[in-house]
Amino acid sequence: EFRRVLFRSTLDDGALRVVDYKTGAPHLEFDGVESLFTGTGKQRLSNILQTLLYAMMLHRSRGCDVEPALYYVRNMNRPGYSPQLDDKQTGVKGARYTLYRERFEELLRAQLAELYDTSVPFRQCEDADTCKYCDFNVICKR
């Protein structure tokens, strides 16, 4: 079971908007839920994945529809900035979590099953640059 205290959540048009603030370069576009689990290194859009995890937890705990959003601090005050996720596969910007729920949770369960499967050997990522700011580089010795 996941638990997380959210930075902020606000009510928006009848749904709850889960907001996560980020300081890095903005990444709001993705190519469908599958891309969140198959990308490697810099192509893996962990901020979007993390925000969908928050949306999943909020949806499950409150039983309401949730819109995941990312506020990138360096861009959020610019005219026309939108914190909404932009799914290029479906062509939907600002989708509610329920659009992704079934497939997202299926892929998440598969990812967690692989992570805890002792028959699957640990592999370091191929791009060592990815490890520069990783919290776990001490564990994998990179």
Kindly label every feature range from the protein language model.
Residues 1-142:
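RecB-family 4Fe-4S metal-dependent nuclease core
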